[in-house]
């Protein structure tokens, strides 16, 4: 099975969710730049929170602000971007159509599937669904390697 790369803010909601998955995971740091060129060495699924929300007319892809800056910097590295295979996003259902919208943005810009969205730190059902879904996803990836991904 592939790896998980994730970002969690100081709220730690995404971190708690990833811990409950009990799968190999690498955290994008909150502060500072990633210095290690081998920070990621294998294909991964990105798990991230959604920032912003509350736009009166729903999601505004041109407004930006949904994807944490640390994740943008991470994905702007061509090597890191070349290894992403899917995205899972956290969000808050109070934001309606913007719930988990960071996943929509990353999926569109990186040309990878949006696999799942969960609220805040997820439920037990979310953990079970993601674990099973990732197992199936990585089996499928092994059978059918992805084509070259687009640049951001």
UniProtKB/Swiss-Prot annotation:
Query: Which biological process, per GO, is one annotated for this protein?
Result: protein modification process
Q: Which SUPFAM superfamilies match?
A: Flavoproteins (SSF52218)
GO terms of molecular function: FMN binding
Query: Highest taxon of the source?
Result: Bacteria
Listed InterPro entries: Flavoprotein-like_sf (IPR029039), RNR_Ib_NrdI_bac (IPR020852), RNR_NrdI (IPR004465)
Homology family: Belongs to the NrdI family.
Tell me which NCBIfam families the record gives: nrdI
Q: Which PANTHER family match?
A: PROTEIN NRDI (PTHR37297:SF1)
Q: What does this protein do?
A: Probably involved in ribonucleotide reductase function.
**Protein name, per record:** Protein NrdI
> Source species, please?
Mycobacterium sp. (strain KMS)
